[in-house]
From Swiss-Prot:
InterPro entries: Aa-tRNA-synt_II, aa-tRNA-synth_II, aa-tRNA-synth_II/BPL/LPL, Lys-tRNA-ligase_II, Lys-tRNA-ligase_II_N, Lys-tRNA-synth_II_C, NA-bd_OB-fold, NA-bd_OB_tRNA. It comes from Pseudomonas aeruginosa (strain ATCC 15692 / DSM 22644 / CIP 104116 / JCM 14847 / LMG 12228 / 1C / PRS 101 / PAO1). Mg(2+) 1 binds at E411, E418. Belongs to the class-II aminoacyl-tRNA synthetase family. CDD domains: LysRS_core (cd00775), LysRS_N (cd04322). The gene is lysS. This is Lysine--tRNA ligase. Homodimer. GO terms for molecular function: ATP binding; lysine-tRNA ligase activity; magnesium ion binding; tRNA binding. Its cofactor is Mg(2+).
């Protein structure tokens, strides 16, 4: 057994000992009273609200007012005379007043452990140091914690353990709680932003018979009653566009997508996506709308449009750079010429040298995107709209009027990561059918991420879809930016993990 394994074994033995002691205390509670886990305590204040409401009250003013409160929380520190509680908003001290609390209560308090949840009544007071606290007149145990909290000096520092036991991480790490409060604020702000502009929030199927709307590998399942294969959706796009056909001209959805692909600091098999569509608009309108949304979000969440991330600062207050795929390759790789990019064999050689997985059947547009992904994407630090994607890799996007070999599409990159994907939607049913057929050929040639042929979607387009612009924004990656989080697992409450050995 290694030293590390020995240390782990000793720690586990110590934890088991503490758990056994706590179970003995719970047994004593069960014996002493009929209900060991009562549910009749009603608090009337959160700690943060008390701190804010009475911030300007002096010690003398609080003594004179004798403001009664009922509070509840988890014991995080026990200093003898003062117990530090934590609720969902803040921490606050409660004072163990030996003059007012009954002897039996004082005796019971001595048996309480860190992690126990208590309810207390008393009056607000302020210490000589200026700290607000509750001078308790009564207190009781509401929930006995059977497992000890992480060591107060080291906390929960093992990253993988934080992800696996997020409930403990949330208990002991204020930074984690802040991250998920920000996530909630971001989603709420997006909903307000779009609703105020006339968008209708909708819900579309998670289980689909044909996985469409993105180039990705789906999760497959089986519907027993219908005896048919079904797929967890990889994107809601084709259903949202059906709604535009039906007459809902501005729609959005914030929900989960599922992709049966790799796990990394940027990828989780289950992730949250915003998709929105607006009729009588194009992809340039969406660029303007996206810039406005991102500036508002940063200002709302951070109080500034300068977004710190690692050792960099992203400037959301400045106009986002707009470059085509083709021009971005030339800008960031001066050794590559336009002639190189327009020659299939030269482009294939560049893509291979850059490390792309070249199968041999790719067209020029696909090769250009491969080169972009390998040689440009990671260099796009400040916000960049990369536009005019080749039609081969944009099967649902409208062709550009001036150059039909590219589409009216953009992807937004910040910090070298794709944050959003948008385009003027293809509403020509015959063109869409042809592109689906090309995707089927790609799939037959070995491209697992190529799209299926969706006959019902073609049927919908044949009724006529107005000129439309659509966009998808990855909520998880956006929250990573706004919370300075290095991994997507930091912003997903319960990320998927490999099984423990």
């Amino acid at each position: 057994m290694s030293d590390q394994q020995l240390d782990q074994h000793e720690l586990q033995q110590e934890e088991n000992k503490l758990i056994a002691q706590r179970k003995e205390k719970l047994a004593a509670v069960r014996e002493a009273r009929a209900i060991a886990f009562p549910n009749d305590f009603r608090r009337d204040a959160y700690f943060a609200d008390l701190q804010k409401q009475y911030a300007d009250k002096t010690k003398e003013e609080l003594e004179a007012a004798a403001i009664p409160v009922k509070v509840a929380g988890r014991i995080m520190l026990n200093r003898g005379s003062f117990i530090v509680l934590q609720d969902s908003s803040e921490r606050l001290q409660v004072y163990v007043n030996r003059k007012t609390l009954p002897e039996e209560t004082l005796a019971e308090i001595k048996t309480w452990d860190l992690g126990d949840i208590i309810g207390a009544e008393g009056v607000l007071a302020r210490s000589g140091k200026g700290d607000l606290y509750v001078d308790m007149t009564s207190v009781r145990l509401l929930t006995k914690s059977l497992r000890p909290l992480p060591d107060k000096h080291h906390g929960l520092t093992d990253t993988e353990q934080r992800y696996r036991q997020r409930y403990v991480d949330l208990m002991v790490n204020e930074e984690t709680r802040h991250t998920f409060r920000v996530r909630s604020q971001v989603i709420a702000h997006i909903r307000r932003f779009l609703s105020e502009r006339g968008f209708l929030e909708v819900e579309t199927p998670m289980l689909q018979t044909i996985p469409g709307g993105a180039a990705a590998k789906p999760f497959e399942t089986h519907h027993n009653a219908l005896d048919m294969a079904m797929f967890l959706r990889i994107a809601p796009e084709l259903y949202l566009k059906r709604l535009v056909v039906g007459g809902f001209e501005k729609v959005f959805e914030i929900n989960r997508n599922f992709r049966n692909e790799g796990v990394s600091t940027r990828h989780n098999p289950e992730f949250t996506m915003l998709e929105f569509y607006q009729a009588y608009a194009d992809y340039e309108d969406n660029m303007d709308l996206t810039e406005e949304l991102f500036r508002e979000l940063a200002q709302s969440v951070l109080g500034t449009t300068d977004v710190p991330y690692g050792d960099k600062v992203f400037h959301f207050g400045e106009p986002f750079v707009r470059l085509s795929v083709f021009d971005s390759i030339l800008k960031y790789n001066p050794e590559i010429t336009a002639a190189d990019l327009n020659d299939v064999e030269k482009a294939r050689a560049i893509a291979k040298k850059a490390g792309a997985k070249v199968l041999g059947h790719e067209g020029l547009g696909k090769l250009q995107v491969m080169i972009f992904e390998e040689l440009v994407e990671h260099k796009l630090e400040q916000p960049h709209f990369i536009t005019r994607y080749p039609f081969e890799v944009s099967p649902l996007a409208r062709r550009n009027d001036e150059d039909p070999s590219v589409t009216d599409r953009f992807e937004l990159f910040i910090g070298g990561r794709e944050i959003a994907n948008a385009y003027s939607e293809l509403n020509d049913a015959e063109d869409q059918a042809e592109r689906f057929m090309l995707q089927v050929k790609e799939k037959d040639a070995g491209d697992d991420e190529a799209m299926h042929y969706d006959a019902d979607f073609i049927n919908a387009l044949e009724y006529g879809m107005p000129p439309t612009a659509g966009e998808g924004i990855g909520i998880d990656r956006l929250v990573m930016l706004l919370t300075n989080s290095p991994s997507i697992r930091d912003v997903i409450l319960f990320p998927h993990m490999r099984p423990q050995a």
